[in-house]
Amino acid sequence: MKKITYGLFFGDSITYGEYDGVFGGWIDILKRYALQKFHEGNGDELILFNLGIGGETTEGLLKRIPHELEARNSANGNIIFLSYGANDLAIKDGKQVVEPEKFKNNITTAVNHARQFSNEIYLVSILPFSEKVDGVVVSSGKLRTNEEVIVYNQILKDLAAEHSLGYIDFYSAFLEDKEILLSADGVHPNEKGYGMMAEVAIPIIEKYL
């Protein structure tokens, strides 16, 4: 019997694929890959939903995750990806948008919601920022530092270990070559960067195809 699994990707503009006019971001690359495998394969299908919203923090995630999961729930199983932190850790008007402890609590709450629909849950690391925007107030009025990225990624790693979740380490994949993998704004990947993210993620979705 044909099996249909849903992959739900929650996140911000990096999940959505902003700044990639070529591929449309890493999830669109994965979507094309999954479609190709379906057409070549045994009838089972993995359907991917890009649920990224630009500028979203974990506060926004908590408002919508119960409804989104309810609306997209496959009887054959779901895979849930949570990709947050780049907006949470930003400092705006002298205040951190979502402080580390609150970030940890929000991700934990989101994971508890996700658990009602899936045992296949992945936390996605925050990417490093370009040196040119590290500690700099940009046009949006936000200031981000690579120091904070390390702190928030550690929270994600610890939660993944504590709750037996997957952890996708895009941070390490980007670190050495970040200046050529990030777009001109120093925060979002360019098409090369999104391609690199897809390369890291394909082996993960491969087991569900």
Name each region found by the language model.
Residues 1-54, 59-60, 66-76, 80, ...:
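Serine-esterase "nucleophile elbow" of acetyl-processing enzymes
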